[in-house]
Amino acid sequence: MRLLTLIFVALIALLQYPLWLGKGSWLRVWDLNQKIVAQKAVNAELKLRNDTLDAEVRDLKQGNAAIEERARSELGMIKQDEVFYQVIDQMPGQPASPPAALTGAQ
């Protein structure tokens, strides 16, 4: 009887080996599931970026408003007969100088 129990334990151990450590083991399945979750997150980020770029391309193809906006903001272009005003912020630590009309200088 003792020999039969030992044989059954050895047989169960041999049957359990592929389940836990073999090619299609639970550990490998768990690892692959973790990789799938991570890849789905990356794919979602890339899809969002692609959708944004696609919308931008469609906008640029449809009208001149997007092209004009880009030319103004990124290239600093202005339309003909427009006047460009540039406001320069004061450097920190410098006192504000009064306008020339207030100081008496003309």
Swiss-Prot record:
Its main location: membrane. Belongs to the FtsB family. This is Cell division protein FtsB. InterPro entries: Cell_div_FtsB (IPR023081), FtsL/DivIC (IPR007060). GO terms for biological process: FtsZ-dependent cytokinesis. The keyword Cell cycle applies. Residues 22-106 are periplasmic. Part of a complex composed of FtsB, FtsL and FtsQ.
